[in-house]
Amino acid sequence: MIVNVIGAGLAGSEVAYNLGKRGIRVRLFEMRPKKMTEVHKTGYFAELVCSNSLKSEDITNAEGLLKAEMRLMGSITLEAAEKARVPSGKALAVDRNIFAKEVTEVIERLESVEIIREEVTEFDPEEGIWVVATGPATSDGLLPFLKKLLGDDLLFFFDAVSPIVTFESIDMECAFWGDRFGKGKDYINCPLTKEEYEEFWKALVEAEVIEMEDFDRKLLFERCQPIEEIARSGKDALRYGPLRPTGLVDPRTGKEPYAVVQLRREDKEGRFYSLVGFQTRLKWSEQKRVLRKIPCLRNAEIVRYGVMHRNVYINSPKLLDIFFRLKKHPNIFFAGQITGVEGYMESAASGIYVAYNVHRILKGLSPLKLPEETMMGALFSYIIEKVEGDLKPMYANFGLLPPLKVRVKDKFEKRKKLAERAIETMKKFLEENPW
């Protein structure tokens, strides 16, 4: 059977490579350079359109642990990155052109991979195996078909998310639980006095923002106004908008605070909370500085920064099973950022995971879920099984992993032990369930 892969980004390239090198026949569709996207510059596979950094290789960093697991499973992304590496301290940074050229040439040399430089605008869902790995820049030609396949309400244009912090880093001596007018206790509320609010407002309006390309601007601002833009419209704008205290009584004072920052739970276990109404395009360093002006968040650990950009992704918890297959069409897989993983390595890792299970299915075996003690397994489980409400894209972070059985106070030592457990778990899994 032929496996059809749409899109030769990081995820699609991993699928084609990991199947192709094992003799599985693959048709890899890539419309570039015949039809370019708004963000790509070349026709190479796995082109890095933003940063040239693939982040840390240190296993006590979540991105480093993710790479260690990917190397165990086999990754064209990391093999090519070694050949394109440029000096960057503990981080893995690459020469973009050398990197993308290497990925392209390796896949072109695989005899079982047929490369088709055409745009796919539709396909027969009942015929063969399909892997949709079209990324955040999915073509306008394919979108109508995907909407028809998935349903209009299940294909999102992702243009804004708020920062997400860990629950354990919120100062609950300062914050209080509650919903407006006493209608529940679903939200964490961070009260601000007049002086604290004005200090926060001043820091927000003076903070540096990320400049967006022209192609993004119309899409973003007609859909969702960043919190810093609301703040610039007037000193009290936030108090009558996302920070309004109406109906929220601080149990310590018996009164409504001057302003309130609300946090909403992001996962079933209650480990992550997002800041309500804090969609932003502030630089990441500025987000950290400004959020720490909020007393209850002075020590907040941000596991996902707020971002605003044009993106397309699907509501994976409703549409996909844990193997990234469409529930109503199990022969159609999705991989990469379109599934709701965020980041270069996360996207590539999802491609490896999909390739692994497609390979098992073609061998007549059942697909397998990766252990949740691994970073890959925890990330994919979060995306598919643990999100409450609508999915917001997530990247690798240690907060996703199940806690250690023994409490470790030192943060570095805790991450080291979590990483060691993850690597040993992945090694054992692959020994018992090889490709």
Swiss-Prot record:
It is found in: Cytoplasm. Belongs to the MnmG family. TrmFO subfamily. Its cofactor is FAD. Keywords: Cytoplasm, FAD, Flavoprotein, Methyltransferase, NAD, NADP, Transferase, tRNA processing. It holds the Pfam family GIDA. InterPro entries: FAD/NAD-bd_sf, MnmG-rel, MnmG_N, TrmFO. The lineage of its organism: Bacteria, Thermotogati, Thermotogota, Thermotogae, Thermotogales. It comes from Thermotoga maritima (strain ATCC 43589 / DSM 3109 / JCM 10099 / NBRC 100826 / MSB8). GO terms for cellular component: cytosol. Its EC number is 2.1.1.74. GO terms for biological process: tRNA methylation; tRNA wobble uridine modification. This is Methylenetetrahydrofolate--tRNA-(uracil-5-)-methyltransferase TrmFO. Its main location: cytoplasm. The keyword Flavoprotein applies. GO terms for molecular function: flavin adenine dinucleotide binding; tRNA (uracil(54)-C5)-methyltransferase activity, 5,10-methylenetetrahydrofolate-dependent. SUPFAM superfamilies: FAD/NAD(P)-binding domain.
